[in-house]
UniProtKB/Swiss-Prot annotation:
Subunit and partners: Part of the 30S ribosomal subunit. Contacts proteins S3 and S10.
Keyword Ribonucleoprotein: yes
Pfam family, one: Ribosomal_S14
Molecular functions per Gene Ontology: rRNA binding; structural constituent of ribosome
Function: Binds 16S rRNA, required for the assembly of 30S particles and may also be responsible for determining the conformation of the 16S rRNA at the A site.
Keywords on record: Ribonucleoprotein, Ribosomal protein, RNA-binding, rRNA-binding
GO cellular component: cytoplasm; small ribosomal subunit
Family: Belongs to the universal ribosomal protein uS14 family.
GO biological process, one term: translation
Stated name of the protein: Small ribosomal subunit protein uS14
Length: 101
């Protein structure tokens, strides 16, 4: 089980990413626009740099929905490998079987 503080920190980052997503997209569009003047671009770059670091989606980390474990995460299920294995063995995940060859 991950520390509660780490799980809460990640939730805080998710909220911040959602809050600034539209603003970041607009600024990135200006920066990538070839028709924009150099002054507009520099202004957009400086404004983008002034946004909080945690508003960047790159800083998000996928965590297990049950334990908060950051490694061994399966996106399809939203669980870490350990919990996924337990759930599959109990039959809680439909359509998944243990491999045998």
């Amino acid at each position: 089980m991950a520390k509660k503080s780490m799980i809460n920190r990640e939730l805080k980052r998710e909220k911040m990413v959602a809050k600034y997503a539209e603003k970041r997209a607009k600024l990135k569009a200006i920066i990538g626009d070839v028709n924009a003047s150099d002054e507009e671009r520099m202004e957009a770059i400086l404004e983008l740099q002034s946004l909080p670091r945690n508003s960047s989606p790159v800083r998000l980390r996928n965590r297990c929905g049950v334990t908060g474990r950051p490694h061994g995460y399966f996106r399809k299920f939203g669980l870490s490998r350990n919990i996924l294995r337990e759930r599959v063995m109990q039959g809680d995940v439909p359509g998944v079987r243990k491999a045998s060859w």
